[in-house]
């Protein structure tokens, strides 16, 4: 026996493979206020007990590996290991379980969503003993939340900057999303803002392509903003997409936007990455820019019910990393979104304290300890007939964003914007008078059509348009 082997044996090391549950399944564990808590939907391979599967998730996302290693004796696993502390069956699913895992705070770098996700949603998602794995929710403890700046400004500061209160904000994504020249693009921006919108938006895949370089687009959009502000007396903005191939280029574009004096820039936070997003968020706070966040690529991660990560986790991560707006689905439009689940993560974006509520998919009580809130953006396949439902679902602290529902108006862009603004003002007035938007919504829109030919024309064009498809990612227990 070699001296090294003797040394290892003398400290209790025993080579080999042992079941994860012997170390990482601890049902007697009482969670701490400083723990990060995770709820995983686990689908074990046939023959793998749920306790072993849950323990494997805790191990492989924290200190464990597939075999015993002698260096375990050089640290305190009891202090640093993740622990699967509870497992429950999923209603209606014989092969799925919810495994609750607690992670000690010391496992994570302060102020880094990147580091947190590298552990919690890292290699463990490819683990062979699991047929599928999905992260349903995270509880971020105040001790960790306080290491983040969060949104650059938040809801109240944005309203003060824009001087707009008592209603949702109105936006429009410029279409076609690709192919316009910078000058024609700026013209569309001007017409929409002059017609009554608060914001217009770059589409998520507009960066700096041969048909429209970013600097030209920024200049023509700034001209459109200032001209429309002068004519309407309202503060206007356009989400200038600063997303780029490098962080340095991204910041350069944000700097140019600041020099132009525009109020807001934009970032694709999933394709751009959390490190880039946090850097841009810090720049925006330091320089008075609002930050609009697009979630391109989210459905690759969150749409399937048994594998990936629910959007509520991505929404929490964005609130930590930083953004003043984020796209959140519409419930009624063309994109996936269950109503109760959407309302759940909308509250997680906006509110300071959110109670556990499994009926809305919220697994943990979340205390944001005064971290600024994020405005949810409803966008994707919506038009004037949707306005009552959108106003009722999302409330005042939201952005209702119409692309084709503005630019597809038969009379042009400005009349499309007028139609949207009239519909919104009618819904807000009716709500303030005590009318039920869910019941009387269509009648409210028809009444407003009498005073707005632009709205009447829009209602005629889109009266038959619906997107009635079943939701893929329903809450457990729903048919």
From Swiss-Prot:
Residues 1-2 form a propeptide. InterPro entries: RuBisCO (IPR033966), RuBisCo_large_chain_AS (IPR020878), RuBisCO_lsu_C (IPR000685), RuBisCO_lsu_C_sf (IPR036376), RuBisCO_lsu_fd_N (IPR017443), RuBisCO_lsu_N_sf (IPR036422), RuBisCO_lsuI (IPR020888). GO terms for cellular component: apoplast; chloroplast; chloroplast envelope; chloroplast stroma; chloroplast thylakoid membrane; cytosolic ribosome; plant-type cell wall; plastid. Binds 1 Mg(2+) ion per subunit. The modification N6-carboxylysine is found at residue 201. One of its GO terms (biological process) is photorespiration. The modification N-acetylproline is found at residue 3. It is found in: Plastid, Chloroplast. Its cofactor is Mg(2+). The disulfide bond which can form in the large chain dimeric partners within the hexadecamer appears to be associated with oxidative stress and protein turnover. Its main location: plastid. The modification Phosphothreonine is found at residue 330. The active site is at residues 175, 294. Keywords: Acetylation, Calvin cycle, Carbon dioxide fixation, Chloroplast, Disulfide bond, Lyase, Magnesium, Metal-binding, Monooxygenase, Oxidoreductase, Phosphoprotein, Photorespiration, Photosynthesis, Plastid. It is an enzyme of class 4 (lyase). The keyword Coiled coil does not apply. The record marks 334 as: Transition state stabilizer. Substrate binds at residues 65, 123, 173-177, 201-204, 294-295, 327, 334, 379-381. PANTHER family: RIBULOSE BISPHOSPHATE CARBOXYLASE, RIBULOSE BISPHOSPHATE CARBOXYLASE LARGE CHAIN. Heterohexadecamer of 8 large chains and 8 small chains; disulfide-linked. The disulfide link is formed within the large subunit homodimers. Interacts with RBCX1 and RBCX1. An intermediate complex made of eight RbcL subunits interacts with the chaperone BSD2. Belongs to the RuBisCO large chain family. Type I subfamily. This is Ribulose bisphosphate carboxylase large chain.
């Amino acid at each position: 026996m070699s001296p090294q082997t003797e040394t290892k044996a003398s400290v209790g090391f025993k080579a080999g493979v042992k079941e994860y549950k012997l170390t990482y399944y601890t049902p007697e564990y009482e969670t701490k206020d400083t723990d990060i808590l995770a709820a995983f939907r686990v689908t074990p391979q046939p023959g793998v007990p749920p306790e072993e599967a849950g323990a494997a998730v805790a191990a492989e996302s924290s200190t464990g590996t597939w075999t015993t290693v002698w260096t375990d004796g050089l640290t305190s696993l009891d202090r640093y290991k993740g622990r699967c502390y509870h497992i429950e069956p999923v209603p209606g699913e014989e092969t799925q379980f919810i495994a609750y895992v607690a992670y000690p705070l010391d496992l994570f770098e302060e102020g880094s969503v990147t580091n947190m996700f590298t552990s919690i949603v890292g290699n463990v998602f490819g683990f062979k003993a699991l047929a599928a794995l999905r992260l349903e929710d995270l509880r971020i403890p105040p001790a960790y939340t306080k290491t983040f700046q969060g949104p650059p400004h938040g809801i109240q500061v944005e309203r003060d900057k824009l001087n707009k209160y008592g209603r949702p904000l109105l936006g429009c994504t410029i279409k076609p999303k690709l192919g316009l020249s910078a000058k024609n693009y700026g013209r569309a921006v001007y017409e929409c803002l002059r017609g009554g919108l608060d914001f217009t938006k770059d589409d998520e895949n507009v960066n700096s392509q041969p048909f429209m370089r970013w600097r030209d687009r920024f200049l023509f959009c700034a001209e459109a903003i200032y001209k429309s502000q002068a004519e309407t007396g309202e503060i206007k903005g356009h989400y200038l997409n600063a997303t780029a191939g490098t962080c340095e280029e991204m910041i350069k574009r944000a700097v140019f936007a600041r020099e132009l004096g525009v109020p807001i820039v934009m970032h694709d936070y999933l394709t751009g990455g959390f490190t880039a997003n946090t850097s841009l968020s810090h720049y925006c706070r330091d320089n008075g820019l609002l930050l609009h966040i697009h979630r391109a690529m989210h459905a690759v991660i969150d749409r399937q019910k048994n594998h990936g990560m629910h959007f509520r986790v991505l929404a929490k991560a964005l609130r930590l990393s930083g953004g003043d707006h984020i796209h959140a689905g519409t419930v009624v439009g063309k994109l996936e979104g269950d109503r109760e689940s959407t309302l759940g993560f909308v509250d997680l974006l906006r509110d300071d304290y959110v109670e556990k509520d499994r009926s809305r998919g919220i697994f943990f009580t979340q205390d944001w300890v005064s971290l600024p809130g994020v405005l949810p953006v409803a966008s994707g396949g919506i038009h004037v007939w949707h306005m009552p439902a959108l106003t009722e679902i999302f409330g005042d602290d939201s952005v209702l964003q119409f692309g084709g529902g503005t630019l597809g108006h038969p009379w042009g862009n400005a009349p499309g914007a007028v139609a949207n603004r009239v519909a919104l003002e009618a819904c807000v007035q009716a709500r303030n008078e005590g009318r039920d938007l869910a019941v009387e919504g269509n009648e409210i829109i028809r009444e407003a059509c009498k005073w707005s030919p632009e709205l009447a024309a829009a209602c005629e064009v889109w009266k038959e348009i619906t997107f009635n498809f079943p939701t893929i990612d329903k809450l457990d227990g729903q048919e």
